[in-house]
């Protein structure tokens, strides 16, 4: 049975290179369209592709063409309606098309350019220039991550690892070394035999001796094997520790009674955005989801986003659980630890100072970054005030306010924007 192997880099899509060139050339217009599309999407649609529209004027390229002046007379091939000298009527019709432009007496127009972005292209543009702040390499404690690398060749191994080229080179060198002396002496004997045969009365004993020598040398050359086991060379591969930066992100969300459905929807959108960003850009990262009201608990992703459990508000319960999990599973010397918290800022007044104490004395010294978003269109409360004091003490503590859905993406980019050197 025949088997087709397609080694084309574009996987059969001939326009892939042109598409990538187009995305690079009009990146600013496409990114603007992507940003506008984000605010119109629901949670379940956030990671899908997008139909992008670019105004025709933005993709205009200079080109050579005939000037409007001058005079030219010609009849195109295949014409059976006009002869030289006829005047062609202007096309009838109204304004020019394209982006609702003003009316034109030319009867011509140009539509906006519309094309589809794939999911991968959409996310690539969506999360460009973002990163986990201050990601540093920690010691590789208890990390069993290895990669196999080439380490030259060896004289022993399994058949699958035979290096054919090196083996044939080795065999060629061995054959040359072993057969060359016999080939040289064979050539000399054949020349001497030819010389004796040209004599009038050659010595038959000498002729017989030379013929035996020639036969001996030929047998010696034939006994040199084409390839021997000592010629075989095998690719040598070794496993080496693979340096990897591992990180853990804690997602903490307030689900108390003061968080109405609109606020919860904003918080869910923010964390889904964060989740997509982390899973796309980092292979070695773990996510821990913590929901809290008067009590906190660690939950899975499904329960974190869609559970309807509610209650009062004690933020310190989430911070205590956060600290407990870090101490039990994520030693700071081996993990880069990040926390993102979303709340409406409504907290039991007596609990806010304790939250400040937990952050300053226990949690912040262990973290790389803490991002707090408060979904509060009205005045801030005690939790925001104590968090501001934490921010003054720790530069790796960031705070932002979100009023509505439209603020999610700008705030997200501000919290996780890539630092330029």
Curated annotation (Swiss-Prot):
Classification via InterPro entries: UPF0229, vWFA_dom_sf
SUPFAM superfamilies: vWA-like (SSF53300)
Coiled coil: none
Pfam families: DUF444
Disulfide bridge map: none
HAMAP family hit by this protein: UPF0229 (MF_01232)
NCBIfam families reported in the protein's UniProt record: PRK05325.1-2, PRK05325.1-3
Family the UniProt entry places it in: Belongs to the UPF0229 family.
Protein name: UPF0229 protein lpp2857
